[in-house]
């Protein structure tokens, strides 16, 4: 086991604070509408340029092990806030640094760190309650666009495109972000349910211009096994042929004789049919087939529930207004399922989302909800260079998370104003002793830090602005983008309540742990002896001449 270096008391804390300051100083230059960029070196390819706090934080590794521990703890604040709220990482870092710096003064003065932490925790609980009271619901498209713009560092185009996307696919819809091909941002909306499986044979194509197979008012056969024997399929095919409507077959696979017969029938014009593989794998495939059945008002023909392909009837088939099948995707538009059944299925999947343990499962379940409930919107990010594309894409993703958070818990006045207005709740807060009261004072001072940093980055005098904002009431604040004072909500400077709350909670949690630290242990770097010359066989023991 390697030898360890141990530091106690002030020498440990001073090292930790130094690490906190290095990381926070690098991150906080990005805060606010006039925040600056940070350039990150890459071992290959062009450097990355970012204004995203968590991206900067993740890059920082310090040589000094004790300083690095402090930096890593603040990094945890940024990444945790990013995970929960999707934005507010810089605000969280600034708050953590402020609480640590203020708190260390009291610790150095000999106060009990545990009571200070209890005071900080009480203050934060009180502030979080007040932020929830201040929050207003974020319902209109205009408010969603404003939240998106602020989060994307005052880029109104990004805010508007996100608001449009949410309007088209609903608040629950899936919105994905991809690299675009042009210089401008574009929005593509896929209506209906789309899944990533295409036609099994190009002979099914009936629209040569678009290279798709389009079926109007088709029946939809859902089968959970492979279809290779045409005899099993014949009864259904005959019933569909009599009805004169096209047929979409979704099965685990359609192969051999069955596929060949379907292709021949299509080419001869006897029956308009398209076969595709079922989406997903294993249990997820079964679930997705059931989703399609609910959406189209059909049943999954599965042997485990006593249904067989040869006995399938038209009543068991799903229906839709239109189906488009491309090489890689199938889209079912306007399924014939009943609204109440679809809503019940959505509710069922939402319960699974609450119980899901992994992010991957949660994401896949949310996609299924969106496909049933609304649709899927794709924002294609446009930029002139790859470096700009990466930076812009990260901002769009941040803005998307922020707007979702705003819809969830409402909005508060932005620019650090919400925290200053919530401080009124701390003035009459009851504490058990003077040291806990000092903990409350630490938070009172720290919640000014985000506004101070925004003003500093804008090139103005922080103390003057903070005093003027404190003199005002309600939503009165300072708009750093225009240099004006006024009603923050009217000026469109909004923050999601969830982002402000998460930033404060995570900052206080980690900063409280740092204040109560009295010992730090790190591995000592090993001094490796210089390697001797290798044994030069046959030269009579001249090996270790070094």
Swiss-Prot record:
It catalyses: ATP + H2O + a folded polypeptide = ADP + phosphate + an unfolded polypeptide. Its EC number is 5.6.1.7. CDD domains: GroEL. One of its GO terms (biological process) is protein refolding. One of its GO terms (molecular function) is unfolded protein binding. NCBIfam families: GroEL, PRK00013.1, PRK12849.1, PRK12850.1, PRK12851.1. Forms a cylinder of 14 subunits composed of two heptameric rings stacked back-to-back. Interacts with the co-chaperonin GroES. This is Chaperonin GroEL 2. ATP binds at residues 30-33, 51, 87-91, 415, 479-481, 495. InterPro entries: Chaperonin_Cpn60_CS, Cpn60/GroEL, Cpn60/GroEL/TCP-1, GroEL-like_apical_dom_sf, GROEL-like_equatorial_sf, TCP-1-like_intermed_sf.
């Amino acid at each position: 086991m390697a030898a360890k270096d141990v530091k106690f008391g002030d020498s440990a804390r001073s090292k930790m604070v130094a690490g906190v300051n290095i990381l926070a100083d690098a991150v906080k230059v990005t805060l606010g509408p006039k925040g600056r960029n940070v350039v990150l070196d890459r071992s290959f390819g062009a450097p990355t340029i970012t204004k995203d706090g968590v991206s900067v934080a993740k890059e920082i590794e310090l040589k000094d092990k004790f300083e690095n521990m402090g930096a890593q703890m603040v990094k945890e604040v940024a990444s945790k806030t990013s995970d929960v709220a999707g934005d507010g990482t810089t605000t969280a870092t600034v708050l953590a640094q402020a609480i640590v710096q203020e708190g260390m003064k009291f610790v150095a003065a000999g106060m009990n760190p545990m009571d200070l932490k209890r005071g900080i925790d009480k203050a934060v609980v009180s502030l979080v309650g007040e932020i929830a009271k201040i929050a207003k619901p974020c319902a209109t498209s205009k408010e969603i666009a404003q939240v998106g713009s602020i989060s994307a560092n005052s880029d109104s185009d990004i805010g508007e495109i996100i608001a449009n996307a949410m309007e088209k696919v609903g608040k629950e819809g899936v919105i994905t972000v991809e690299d675009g091909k042009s210089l401008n941002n574009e929005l593509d909306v896929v209506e209906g349910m789309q899944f990533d499986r295409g036609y099994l044979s190009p002979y099914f194509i009936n629209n040569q211009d678009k290279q798709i197979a389009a079926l109007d008012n088709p029946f939809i056969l859902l089968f959970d096994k492979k279809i290779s024997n045409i005899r099993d399929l014949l009864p259904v095919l005959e019933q569909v042929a009599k009805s004169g409507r096209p047929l979409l077959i979704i099965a685990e696979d359609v192969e051999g004789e069955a596929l060949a017969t379907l292709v021949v029938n299509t080419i001869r014009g006897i029956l308009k049919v398209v076969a595709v593989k079922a989406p997903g794998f294993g249990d997820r495939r079964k679930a997705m087939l059931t989703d399609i059945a609910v959406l189209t008002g059909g049943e999954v023909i599965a042997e485990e529930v006593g249904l067989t392909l040869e006995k399938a009837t038209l009543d068991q088939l799903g229906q839709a207004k239109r189906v488009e099948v491309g090489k890689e995707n199938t889209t079912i538009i306007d399924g014939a399922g009943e609204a109440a059944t679809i809503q019940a299925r959505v509710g069922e999947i939402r319960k699974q989302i609450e119980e899901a343990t992994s992010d991957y499962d949660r994401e896949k379940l949310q996609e299924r909800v969106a496909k049933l409930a609304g649709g899927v919107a794709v924002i294609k990010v446009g930029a002139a260079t790859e470096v700009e594309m990466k930076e812009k894409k990260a901002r769009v993703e941040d803005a998307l998370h922020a707007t979702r958070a705003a819809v969830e818990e409402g909005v508060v006045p932005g620019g650090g104003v919400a925290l200053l207005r919530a401080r009124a709740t701390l003035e009459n807060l009851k504490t058990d002793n003077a040291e806990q009261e000092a903990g409350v004072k630490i938070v009172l001072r720290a919640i000014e830090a985000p506004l101070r940093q925004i003003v500093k980055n804008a090139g103005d005098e922080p103390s003057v602005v903070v005093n003027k904002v404190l003199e005002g009431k309600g939503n009165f604040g300072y708009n750093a983008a225009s240099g004006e004072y006024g009603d923050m909500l009217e000026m469109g400077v909004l923050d999601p309540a969830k982002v402000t709350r998460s930033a404060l909670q995570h900052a206080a949690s980690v900063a409280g742990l740092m204040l109560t630290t009295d010992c730090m242990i790190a591995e000592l770097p090993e001094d490796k002896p210089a390697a001797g010359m290798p044994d030069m066989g046959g030269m009579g023991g001249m090996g270790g001449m070094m």
